[in-house]
Curated annotation (Swiss-Prot):
Keywords, comma-separated and alphabetical: Acetylation, Heme, Hydrogen peroxide, Iron, Metal-binding, Mitogen, NADP, Oxidoreductase, Peroxidase, Peroxisome, Phosphoprotein
Chain's gene name: CAT
Modified residues (N6-succinyllysine): 13, 221, 306, 480, 522
Subunit structure: Homotetramer. Interacts (via microbody targeting signal) with PEX5, monomeric form interacts with PEX5, leading to its translocation into peroxisomes.
Full protein name: Catalase
The organism of origin for this protein: Cavia porcellus (Guinea pig)
Length: 527
């Protein structure tokens, strides 16, 4: 019934109730001038033409024409909330960052969950990795831990990221999602096997945002107060327990409630059922990194928990919904390069690429002064630097302080204790191909040891159900990769594909050689 709906459905009703004792505000233009009539446009007579002097109309339309800002190129569909992080265990022997300085310390945070490939209006229940980004408002500035709900990723080299995302989005001619593009890229880059296997497992469709884990995914460096450094990975374990959606339920919800994840999160917080996660770290010394059997900075691989156990750190609790979605969720900007002293990047190639890409896309989407937007502002510290001006500078622009450095007028100076950790680096400058690195050992362990028989069956069914729509030559390349992981893995998928291909023979296709010249149409079966 309309009188007993959930908090998200009753948002307008609750807003009115909260203002019950207040008189309605006076309607104004954007310039604050009172408006006498908002329902009828100004004309010459009841049937005459409009007048340019109707500033009520022009003010409204001019703003309406500019309401939309560029959509995020990835992670466009998302839900956000505000929270606090509380330290429960001492890790100061590893990290000097003040966010961890003593047990019981609380830090305000903002969190955004998202899908990756879909547009802003896409469904929350698609099979897709989920973004899990956390913004810590610390007294040493912003710390953005920008991760996913998976501990690994599809690629290990940042140069491939634009092509990878293009392959997951829409065909440039048809504007349709294209299984050929997706599986062609995945099959040509076997390092994607680990993430693809995770994606098509049960965890590929989480039950909303509250029932999934989060991971920093990358390898980071922690530095303690004595200048000693270790490598680190961050993990958020959901306190609500892991829950996933079946393929059938996900398909149903994508039609009945495409905003299922957003609604579920909003209602949980609105009713006081605050979701929480426990933060853990894994630690690896520099000496251990040198003897690690894989590249410890490879984003397509994990650190085994038996060798590098989880160390508890603290608790993240979501306890406030956004007051306004655009102001606090659409405009929030996460940047992996925002790191306070004590937290630094590792040589992880993907992380290194993101250090540039994320702030660059924010400057495009939100403007060069996006850090002045309230939700992005490092409000718990004083920003003092030599950056000035630019579009939409809405502060005092640091007044009359010098805008050059060095200077002789008591302007901001360096803090030597904030110097980065010194590390040794050597090698020949070059472009190093990592395609043939071990891409199967950890995937084999995932398939044979992590998954049970029923989970393996569903994994193979999910992969075959998606791969069947790709051309046969792409199917063959993909199956070969799965065979390399384990014969059972590849054989199961091939058996399912054989059935699909008999039921739905492939139609004629057109292919193009690399330089774009046209080839004659061929049957897919002959490729």
């Amino acid at each position: 019934m309309a009188d007993s709906r959930d908090p998200a459905s009753d948002q307008m009703k609750h807003w009115k109730e909260e203002r019950a004792a207040q008189k309605p505000d006076v309607l104004t233009t954007a310039g604050g001038n009172p408006v006498g009539d908002k329902l009828n446009i100004m004309t010459v007579g009841p049937r005459g033409p409009l007048l340019v002097q109707d500033v009520v109309f022009t003010d409204e339309m001019a703003h309406f024409d500019r309401e939309r800002i560029p959509e995020r190129v990835v992670h466009a569909k998302g839900a956000g909330a505000f929270a606090y992080f509380e330290v429960t265990h001492d890790i100061t022997k590893y990290c000097k960052a003040k966010v961890f300085e003593h047990i019981g310390k609380k830090t305000p945070i903002a969190v955004r969950f998202s899908t990756v490939a879909g547009e802003s209006g896409s469904a929350d229940t698609v099979r897709d990795p989920r973004g899990f980004a956390v913004k810590f408002y610390t007294e040493e500035g912003i710390w953005d831990l920008v991760g996913n709900n998976t501990p690994i990723f599809f690629i290990r080299d940042a140069l491939l990221f634009p092509s990878f995302i293009h392959s997951q989005k829409r065909n440039p001619q048809t504007h349709l999602k294209d299984p050929d593009m997706m599986w062609d890229f995945w099959s040509l880059r076997p390092e994607s096997l680990h993430q693809v296997s995770f994606l098509f497992s049960d965890r590929g469709i989480p039950d909303g945002h509250r029932h999934m884990n989060g991971y920093g995914s990358h390898t980071f460096k922690l530095v303690n107060g004595s200048g000693e450094a270790v490598y680190c990975k961050f993990h958020y374990k959901t306190d609500q327990g892991i829950k996933n959606l079946s393929v059938e339920d996900a398909a149903r919800l994508s039609q009945e409630d495409p905003d299922y994840g957003l609604r579920d999160l909003f209602n949980a917080i609105a009713t006081g059922n605050y979701p929480s996660w426990t933060l853990y770290i894994q630690v690896m010394t520099f000496q251990q990194a040198q003897s690690f059997p894989f590249n410890p900075f490879d984003l397509t691989k994990i650190w085994p928990h038996k060798d590098y156990p989880l160390i508890p750190v603290g608790k993240l609790v979501l306890n406030r919904n956004p007051v306004n979605y655009f102001a606090e969720v659409e405009q929030i900007a996460f940047d992996p390069s925002n790191m306070p002293p004590g937290i630094e990047p590792s040589p992880d190639k993907m992380l290194q690429g993101r250090l540039f890409a994320y702030p660059d896309t924010h400057r495009h989407r939100l403007g060069p002064n996006y850090l002045q937007i309230p939700v992005n502002c490092p409000y718990r510290t004083r920003v003092a630097n030599y950056q000035r001006d630019g579009p939409m500078c809405v502060t005092d622009n640091q007044g009359g302080a010098p805008n050059y450095y060095p200077n002789s007028f008591s302007a901001p100076v360096e803090q030597r204790q904030a110097l980065e950790h010194t590390s040794r680096c050597s090698g020949d400058v070059g472009r190093y191909n990592s395609t043939d690195d071990d891409n199967v050992t950890q995937v084999r362990a995932f398939y044979t040891q992590v998954l049970n028989e029923e989970q393996r069956r569903r994994l193979c069914e999910n992969i075959a159900g998606h791969l069947k729509d790709a051309q046969l030559f792409i199917q063959k390349k993909a199956v070969k990769n799965f065979m390399d992981v384990h014969p059972d893995y590849g054989n199961r998928i091939q058996t399912l594909l054989d059935k699909y291909n008999v039921e739905k023979p492939k139609n004629a296709i057109h292919t193009f050689v690399q330089d774009g010249s046209h080839l004659s149409a061929k049957e897919k079966a002959n490729l």
